[in-house]
Amino acid sequence: MEVLMAERANLVFHNKVIDGTAMKRLISRLIDHFGMAYTSHILDQVKTLGFQQATATSISLGIDDLLTIPSKRWLVQDAEEQSFILEKHHHSGNVHAVEKLRQSIEIWYATSEFLRQEMNPNFRMTDPFNPVHIMSFSGARGNASQVHQLVGMRGLMSDPQGQMIDLPIQSNLREGLSLTEYIISCYGARKGVVDTAVRTSDAGYLTRRLVEVVQHIVVRRKDCGTARGISVSLGNGMMSENIFIQTLIGRVLADDIYMGTRCIATRNQDIGSGLVNQFITFRAQPIYIRTPFTCRSTSWICQLCYGRSPTHGDLVELGEAVGIIAGQSIGEPGTQLTLRTFHTGGVFTGGIAEHVRAPSNGKIKFNEDLVHPTRTRHGHPAFVCSIDLYVTIESEDILHNVNIPPKSFLLVQNDQYVESEQVIAEIRAGTSTLNFKEKVRKHIYSDSEGEMHWNTDVYHAPEFTYGNVHLLPKTSHLWILLGEPRRSDLISLSIHKDQDQMNARSFSVKKRSISNLSVTNDQVRHKFFSSDFFGKKEEEHPDYSELNRIVRCNLRYPTIPYADYDLLAKRRRKRFIIPLQSIQERENELMPPSGISIEIPINGIFRINSILAFFDDPRYRRKSSGITKYGTIEVDPIAKKEDLIEYRGVKEFKPKYQIKVDRFFFIPEEMHILPGSSSIMVRNNSIIGIDTQIALTTRSRVGGLVRVEIKKKRIELKIFSGDIHFPGETDKISRHSGVLIPPGTGKTNSKESKKGKNWIYVQRITPTNKKYFVLVRPVVTYEITDGINLVRLFPPDLLQEMDNVQLRVVNYILYGNGKPIREIYNTSIQLVRTCLVLNCTQDKKSSYIEETRTSFVEIGINGLSRDFIKIDLVKSPISYTAKRNDPSRSGLIYENGSDCTNINPFSSRFFYYSNARIKESLNQNQGTIHTLFNRNKEYQSLIILSSSNCFRMGPFNNVKYHNVIKESIKKDPPIPIRNLLGPLGTALKTANFYPFSHLITYNQILVINYLQLDNLKQTFQVIKYFLMDEIGKIYNYDLCSNIILNPFNLNWYFLQHNYCEGMSTIMSLGQFICENVCIAKNGPHLKSGQVLIVKMDSVVIRSAKPYLATPGATVHGHYGEILYEGDTLVTFIYEKSRSGDITQGLPKVEQVLEVRSIDSISMNLEKRVEGWHECITRTLGIPWGFLIGAELTIVQSRIALVNKIQKVYRSQGVQIHNRHIEIIVRQITSKVLVSEDGMSNVFLPGELIGLLRAERMGRALEEAICYRAVLLGITKASLNTQSFISEASFQETARVLAKAALRGRIDWLKGLKENVVLGGMIPVGTGFEGLVHSSRQHTNLSLETKNNNIFEGEMRDILFHHRKFFDSCFSKNFHDTSEQSFIGIGFNDS
């Protein structure tokens, strides 16, 4: 006792508050000083003291102790205000969705962090003895972030995919959560409800699989005698000291360790903490340790390779079941691992950037040539510098120099005045290799309906030439011009045509939609109705617009009397039919009318050699399905024109084959497509008669052989008509199948030989387990003639002006050789199409002509309406008068890369309205119809300019120009009208922007007044009528001459004074205006839109919605296409850093152990295994390459796997000793696959054998066995063990037992599980003794054979010669695995 007192007197007396960490330090010093027993005695006293004090002060925790932080209210308010401003920016198109998401997450993250920092000072000031504060601060219970959730705010959560939800949980648990917040936190939080429920079962199953793999591994021997080891070194900085200590303690050295000449530790010595400290002090390098990987045994492990037992700190005892311990050590913490870690979603790229702040107030100066403008990741404008930049701040009396490193963002402008502590630059944090980034796609969906436009040139994505995916080269806006879509499935019945104005009285077709029957080739079925203007009732012409999805109507255009004009389905047509028969002929014949279809591409541009018109000859039309064959005659299968159809993202080639043949064959067959659920009443390969019932509702039309095929949820049933022929032995025909036999050959051995009659098609059919027979099918032969001369159909004067355009006739077969053709819903199938191909003669003058543009022109004169086809030659480098720099012009880049400005894909129409029409159009306009394609390539009408999506700004100034004009017109009528209204006296076409050609009658009243007078006749006699082309040129199509008047400049400007800024705004037609731009004196303009009409006193603006897109974004959809709400508009690809992985935790461990390749695994190990293997084999050749390659590959992949699994556990704060993981990894990497390269006599190629067994066999037979390393998952490894009883008790019991019985496998009952199943004694612990067999002589044998080993000398040389090569391999392949490298001493020992 006195001794104790004396020692106590020498102790230092501490008088201070201790928290958890100080307590830890105290305990460790006590243990070092006094040992274990004494320390526990002291701690006991401390505990009693603590309880006494707690009882005295009576700490309790009630709900009133949870005090919220007073500053929370205004902090949250401030964050909400910032979010609101951000939302406004997003709405007006200044930032896009990704930038908005990033910024809002940073705003809320900062708010939440600030609240958390406020928490402690607040408690200290208001209530220092608050139990919550005492507990969390002293480390007794809870930490800062938990308390923060109780009294601060819960903050941001991640969704099930690990993405951040940008809706933060503002309440804390004291205030209670709203329903939305509760649901978000169920998913996002670390121990969320959803998370825990799933996790328990997953972890249990993982444990079971792990134990299954390693249950037979028991410590059986003291030493296996291996000389190999794995090197661990601290020197290269990749490994923290902490991990280094954890790795070494409890291991056994594989080699002596020297410090200079002095040996500080010997081989087979186990490492304690003292030795580790010496290693750290002396920086001994490298240290070779023994691990389960290096143990030479196959199905057990030795004491020295395992090391110390974690329970009592001595070497592990013999007979200990270390395998099961390892499996459980890894599986059990799985319940603590989350399925996803809770972190801030990795939204901050490369960590939060550092800020550079201004040292004092002053004016900032820098060299502007060194910076270029850019956007920060929040969408703010900034400058980025590529090299070091010196920034000077001039304050009153002193100059400050600030150096800004390269790649930083400068947030201020030159000569700007900055205040002290203002952020002037943002330094990008150096991206470390550990935080690897991942690319994330974010889709932006449109939230309104309308038409799509963009303001910049857009590149077509090269892999989708015909698709609708475009890439943006620079930052720009996408606009959706608002409109109300109207379903127009029966377009031709609707009275309205594109660009018509709807009056209040006008009516549209009631909605009668025909559902689009989806057919096998994804064609869209349209039904069109044509009105017959000659008193007959309507007839129906169903048509598949298959090739270009272009609508066709068989309408006749005689001169239509004015009264019927409105009935004509006025619509933009892309195909046009020139009648071939007069109406009298058509009434006499019952044949369906066939006309020439003129096919105009969607953009109205013909390339050379493209098809202008085609004629479907009724002789080549079939009603039934079948197969086309060209027979034995050669055909030139050049796909002259390949139509690539992209329909809902599916690419499909439709080649047309140019025929060089004079006949082809069609083999008819009957085909029924039935839904998968229907019951079929006939068997496959059976023979039926005519009108047999084959399904509940279907009867056969012909008799013959039935073939049934089941494809993707539907059943195809084909009936082949023809004769069945059972061949004899000597029959030649029987050897052929699928051949055409010309007439006159006849059939041998057949009585009914049809000589010289027809061609026949022979098909050989082998039903199951029956004798095969031959089916002889009839063939329809088609001769191909030249068809109609199409060129004559065009009036000669049409081609006079273009003598260098020639048309030639080509026949195309629409279906390839042997392609099955299906009839769909009783439509006829056209087999041959006669096409008129446009061919420009390339003479010197017109050598630059590459394409012609065509459009249909509908001209109305005095109430009559006729249609013409107009062909214009276009010179190839398209040069229009449009100014390239004009921001309001829209450009479009076509596939050939030339920049076509303002090509309107819809042909314009211009009408000269007679009196009655113009009067009618004076009624209140309700809107304008605009017909476009939507994404499914169907026609669709939009109502634009209705009161809902169009508004008028103005008046700008108070002068009424109307009166002035009226007076001047009365004096001298024709001239002012010409000056004001354009040559036609009606309207200026306001469509300089691209798919609009809008007719707006402007000052209509004046027109009417003076059209009634006769003095305008002269004007209109000179100008017969005008056509207005898409580009805005006005053509004077006088019949005698072909003069082009000066192009009408539509891009006219309107100058008016803007009183907001005192400067004038120039407004042009078609210009897009964002929100809050000043265009009038009465304040800023409130909505965004596009200028449609500019009048003297007002503008009409069509509502539009901007979406910002940055470079590299992908735009979906074509220009001018109709979008519905919810369609994908843009896809952004942005980088975000991830801390480790987002799918962390259990799923990640399982992926690694099951060796599944998932994107989130940074390196797909299986591929790397093959890669290393090939690389080494190439270097060293066979067989050395194989042996060394397999060996190295296995070592490398083992180290990589261990590191991966450890990384996941460490990231979650779970400590597992490496050797547990090593035991499991050893089992899943211990098999090799015998390869075919060096054929050995022992194993079959493709056989899975143990690595050690392969090596021993190679030594015994003194020949090289070639094999490669494979990675098995834990499930596979448990099904590939030496014991079939253990396998059968795990999975697939019947299969395993059956296979074992067939192979005659023997189970030696070495593992635990087999013995448990059979009720024997398990070979561990006390039951271990019976199994130990004295195998000393075995060891001696192996030592003697050393000298005879054929590999020894050469192997050593090769290994040491290539040592550097291997080392470099390692350092390249692993970023974090060089903590353990590989020592290649003596492969002969293995």
From Swiss-Prot:
Gene3D superfamilies on file: 1.10.132.30, 1.10.150.390, 1.10.1790.20, RNA polymerase Rpb1, domain 3
Gene Ontology terms for molecular function: DNA binding; DNA-directed RNA polymerase activity; zinc ion binding
Main location: plastid
GO annotation (BP), single: DNA-templated transcription
EC number: 2.7.7.6
UniProt similarity note: Belongs to the RNA polymerase beta' chain family. RpoC2 subfamily.
PANTHER family, A to Z: DNA-DIRECTED RNA POLYMERASE SUBUNIT BETA (PTHR34995:SF1)
Name by which UniProt lists this protein: DNA-directed RNA polymerase subunit beta''
Organism the protein comes from: Daucus carota (Wild carrot)
Gene name in the database record: rpoC2
